[in-house]
Amino acid sequence: MVINRYTVSCGTCQTNHTLRISLGTDRYQEHTFPCVNCGEDMSVRLDIDFDDWGKFDNLPGFKAPKTKFSTVSNCEVCQAEGTVINLDPNFLVTENFLHDQYYFSSLHQAERLGAFERIEKTKDYFSGKQILDIFSLVGGFRNLREKLEFLIKAWSLHNRGKENLALEYLDKLAEDLFDKSYPLHESIQMFSALFIGEERSEEMKTILNEIKEAKSKNSLQYYNLRSYYLEEHVEDCLERHLESFTDYLKNYDDLLQLYLYAKQKQKIPEDISLSSKRFRNLKMFYGNIYEHITSSIFILAGINNILSGRNFDMFEQMDLKKYMTINKANRANPFKDRHSFDPVVKCLDSTLRNASHHGAMKLQINSNIIQYRSGGTGALNSISYTEYLQKCNEMMFSSCMLLIVELMILKNWI
């Protein structure tokens, strides 16, 4: 809950801004925001050294990590104060308090996310000298960006046969996250479970129980499905999941703002402002991850076939070969009545996918509203950028849930 104060001037119109930046939970954070005068984007960066803490001269007993502030684009450090802008990497900023010099977004939004109710239930947070970590209380975990980097690096090194190097990064991933270092697939599975959170982990158990039932009901067909996955799809499927994690990391600063809200399935507050808005980088994220998910849900379709008393590759009206050629927007239809699979597919929106995949989306000037057309030529639709970020996070959670399913089948952990 530490806020640092910096002054910068816009590189386009020289308007001064006073930035009140909340220190987040990663070793660095970037914010891209519009100038209050000309509207052109400015970007700044804050590096945080959690290994080096300094004291406050006017607050005896309080410490904060040392930081390094730098400008990234279209602004420079200045001495004069300007319009106050509150920026927070982890929590949304309430619109009415965007320019309030006394506002603490983390406290305000943590209350919305139920942090204080959890404090009452978790007295350990007040024991001894333990620090109250609001971000962890509401479902986050520290150094998420760095942990994503370690996971992606280990995965990439493994794919190129650099096992010794991969193990080094798996060790880094495990530090302060797992009880010990684990092999790659176990690490991916455990990280994915942490990433999606407790509520979705419970939904994940229900899905895995369905898979266990399919295996018990017809083990021959279950292992035929597993063989089909291993022989025809495993490399492509896992590569797509790696790409999804990589895309998430590339757009981390924007996506993290809605991570907690999506993780808790919270309704987005209407009176909020974003602390980073790099829409150009993110406009194709939804479409890409939609493609990844719908290319892999044949596994759930196969499990549904077995549970329905059929061979894994036989649907009510087609076989698997035909199924793999139908429009991806329709690939969840064969199991639409098996609601235990809904958590993986209910976030799929083919209209938004078409617009995102074809780049047919535009963030309106001086606005938080995205307008888009399906396929670039369909009816005009609109969505707030905040809601778009929430949907992108929900898609990432769905991808992680599907990845867990694939790993459980791949490793024969069912």
Stretches found by the model and what they are:
Residues 237, 274-288, 387:
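Non-transmembrane, amphipathic alpha-helical segments
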Residues 5-7, 282-346, 360:
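Flexible secondary-structure boundary motifs
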Residues 12, 37, 43, 51, ...:
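Amphipathic, Lys/Arg-enriched alpha-helical patches that create a basic surface
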Residues 326-337, 351-352, 366-370, 381-385:
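Functional cleft and adjacent loop/helix regions within the main domain
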Residues 1-276:
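Extended intrinsically disordered or low-complexity regions, especially N/C-terminal cytosolic tails and loops
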Residues 268-277, 327-338, 375-379:
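Short, charged/polar, low-complexity loop and linker segments
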Residues 14, 357-361, 374-376:
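Short, flexible loop/turn elements at secondary-structure junctions
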Residues 341-370:
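Histidine-centered, metal-coordinating catalytic motifs and their short helical/loop contexts
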